[in-house]
Amino acid sequence: MFATEARQRYQQELTGIRDAGLFKEERYIHSPQGADIEVEFPAGDPARRVINLCANNYLGLSSHPEVVAAARAGLDSRGYGMSSVRFICGTQDIHRELERRLTSFLGTEDTLLFPSCMDANGGVFEAILTDQDVMIADRLVHASIVDGMRLAKAQQDTFKHSDLAHLEEKLQEHQDKRQRLVITDGVFSMDGDLAKLDEIVALAEKYAGPPRARPPPRSRSRRTR
């Protein structure tokens, strides 16, 4: 009985989504990812060649012959996947070697690999922040950053998109926090505009340092007749 009622309820919801034009149909790709691909859409129609403007394959590396050959060599030598997270069974030595090479190339203290940028954004804030800290993010940051912020215990706040005056107000407002972490995209994925990184860094450095007592609100004087 319950299963029947649940199925009917879900079917009604799906019907409403379709009627509103919001139901997403999958596209079946019959070719490697690239600037143009062979796509079957709608499902059941003959596949046709189309220009692909929506993939994250910006440099075309997913089907580059050298990348494909390296992936094939990795499968032959190490098999498919880790079969666990790295701290259970261990991590592959070739992963650690890649981290070392990236560290040398970037000139950083160390490097940590994640399976995707989504996973990296989901893991970084929780690891470095506590409930004594605050995250101050541009309101148009990527959804993966928003998800990562939700996992952290730190307080969340935002500033208007690329509005440095508003960011400074937020930094002043949160001077009582142990750490004030400013979060922004480098290139904003929806609009394509660039973050004002030099100015953001300058503001972050201006308000860096130990926590300070929050200044009292300004009192408003009243005029008397």
What are the residue ranges of the model-derived segments?
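N-terminal "arm"/small-domain region of PLP-dependent enzymes with the aminotransferase-like
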Residues: F2, A6, Y10-R78, G209
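Buried hydrophobic positions in well-ordered alpha/beta secondary-structure cores of metabolic enzymes
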Residues: G21, L53, L102, A120, ...
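Active-site phosphate-binding strand-loop segment of PLP-dependent enzymes
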Residues: N57, D157, H161-R214
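Short, small-residue-enriched loops and turns at beta-alpha junctions
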Residues: L61, I88-Q92, A143, L164-A165, ...
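Conserved N-terminal alpha-helix of the aminotransferase class I/II PLP-enzyme fold
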Residues: V68-S116
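Conserved PLP-anchoring active-site segment centered on the Schiff-base-forming lysine
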Residues: V124-A143
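Active-site-proximal loop->helix
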Residues: A127, I145-A152
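Short, structured coil segments at secondary-structure junctions
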Residues: D131, L151-K153, Y207
